[in-house]
From Swiss-Prot:
Protein name: Peptide 1196
Tissue localization of expression: Expressed by the venom gland.
Any single GO CC term annotated in Swiss-Prot or TrEMBL for this entry: extracellular region
Chief location bin: secreted
Keyword terms, alphabetized: Secreted
Secreted in keyword set: yes
Subcellular locations according to the entry: Secreted
Amino acid sequence: KIKETNA
């Protein structure tokens, strides 16, 4: 499972 976060 890959989690990607962008702010």
